[in-house]
């Protein structure tokens, strides 16, 4: 009986480890094509202030945060974020937007967004800002675009 219990524990441990190793992978070549296509699209919105692309993943890195400083103060109504996901499983990103004024950085606005290549708006109430800090982490490595 002891050997059967030992085998059951060993098999259970292997199954548990296999379950933990299952991480959704984003096709980074397809994600790069998506970023390139989005960047090549002309932005003709009169309220457009800028855009940035972040390489995000499960950990904070230098490539998962960007600060956009504007030449002159601008009034922002929203910031749109979009990230590329996976066809097999849902990929999400936690996005933090911090507004920068002449008084310093404000409190971060944090949103969880689905990485479905569609824009998700973060409302900033028409505030006048000198810059924006966007930071994100995602459930797996992907690209996030902020405009």
Give the ranges of each region predicted by the language model.
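Short, surface-exposed beta-strand/strand-loop-strand elements in extracellular ectodomains
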Residues: 88-106, 144-147
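Extracellular/mature segments of secreted proteins
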Residues: 3, 27-28, 90-95, 108, ...
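Extracellular and analogous surface-interaction loops
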Residues: 58-60, 65-77, 101-102, 121-128
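Noncatalytic modules at the cell exterior or secretory-pathway interfaces
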Residues: 74-81, 120-142, 146-147
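C-terminal motif of bacterial Sec signal peptides marking the signal peptidase cleavage site
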Residues: 15-19
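Bacterial N-terminal signal peptides that target proteins for export
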Residues: 1-9
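Sequence contexts marking disulfide-bonded cysteines in secreted/extracellular proteins
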Residues: 21, 82-84, 114-116
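Transition segment at domain starts
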Residues: 22-71, 108-110
């Amino acid at each position: 009986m002891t050997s059967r219990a030992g085998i059951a524990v060993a098999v259970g441990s292997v199954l548990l480890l296999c379950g933990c190793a299952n991480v959704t992978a984003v096709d980074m070549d397809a994600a790069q094509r998506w970023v390139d296509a989005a960047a090549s699209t002309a932005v003709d919105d009169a309220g457009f202030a800028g855009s940035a692309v972040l390489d995000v993943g499960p950990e904070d890195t230098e490539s998962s945060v960007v600060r956009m400083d504007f030449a002159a103060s601008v009034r922002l109504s929203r910031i749109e974020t979009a990230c590329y996901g996976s066809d097999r499983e849902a990929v999400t990103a936690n996005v933090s937007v911090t507004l920068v004024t002449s008084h310093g950085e404000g409190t971060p606005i944090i949103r969880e967004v689905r990485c479905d290549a569609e824009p998700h708006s973060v409302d900033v109430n028409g505030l006048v800002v000198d810059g924006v800090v966007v930071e994100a982490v995602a459930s797996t490595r992907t690209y996030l675009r902020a405009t």
